[in-house]
């Protein structure tokens, strides 16, 4: 018995088609008369076209609803990813403490405070390049530590301390420099020269000049002997140097314990003469000590600032007599006293001393630790 399938009403068919409940073979045409139904079934081309139209409408309806969900989940995932990224960003640091504040941390071993002269507006932008030759000896740790304590007080100015070891760098000197907390560079030179020879010092100075020249360091270059005693006023005056400056330096003789004063005689900042004690030093062109002058480091690598354009490079003379080496080096920087400035204006202040101290023997305990001669001489009762 043939079953008779009743079609849905037109309103119900539209409702089912809108919500995708009709299958691909459901018809959306309204009921018609048998004559019209037979005519539609007899035309297969129109039926196929009508079936394709129904599939397109159903697919368009089924793909329309997931788009808002996809957009919502995409935005949610992006937001969660940004939260994970923001959680790994560096947190802002707290306010930088004011060094002049009364609530700063107090050092349990305070350093004696010295009155500082008023600094110039450009003092914070001038690099001080301090060159110190050193060699292995029992008093090396004492010299380097004392020099470092002086340089640590120059916290208001950029500083680079170049320490040049005669021979290979030693672990003892490197450890002593690391404890100073001063920005430094520790290098060795003249490995083939005996450290007790009198001609190793020019090689050390030239090694430091090579560093300044190769890296094009711009600042005030000063040769500070490790045996010297320095005032803070000296380093504050060094920041104001424009080209070349000099000042008098007293030196205590090791043999006679006499004070030898060498340096310029100035009038309103202009060098008008020289003061010297030894008669043999009168043969020199400039009567100054190696720790009694400073100059702009750009004179080493900028030919436009040199007084003698014929010099290819400015280096410390190595084949000149020791007493004439300082004057021969300065002759490469300036032509005469008119290109010098005396500091202070009248050159009447002593701002550093050259005081030799300690044994000159190159033998010293390894690690500065004594392992022998530690027997008990006076026992406890």
From Swiss-Prot:
Glycosylation sites: 194, 296
Record topological domains on the Lumenal side: 91-381
Subcellular compartments: Golgi apparatus membrane
A GO molecular-function annotation: xylosyltransferase activity
Record's compositionally biased regions (Low complexity): 26-46
Keywords from the UniProt entry: Cell wall biogenesis/degradation, Glycoprotein, Glycosyltransferase, Golgi apparatus, Membrane, Signal-anchor, Transferase, Transmembrane, Transmembrane helix
One protein family per Pfam: Glyco_transf_43
Transmembrane regions: 70-90
EC number(s) stated in the UniProt entry for this protein: 2.4.-.-
CC per GO annotation: Golgi membrane
Bilayer topology term: Single-pass type II membrane protein
Predominant cellular place of this UniProt entry's protein: Golgi
Cytoplasmic-side segments: 1-69
Region Disordered, residue ranges: 21-50, 96-122
Enzyme superclass (EC): transferase
GO biological process annotation, one example: plant-type secondary cell wall biogenesis
Family stated for the protein in its record: Belongs to the glycosyltransferase 43 family.
Annotated function: Involved in the synthesis of glucuronoxylan hemicellulose in secondary cell walls.
Protein name according to UniProt: Probable glucuronosyltransferase Os04g0103100
Organism annotation: Oryza sativa subsp. japonica (Rice)
Gene: GT43H
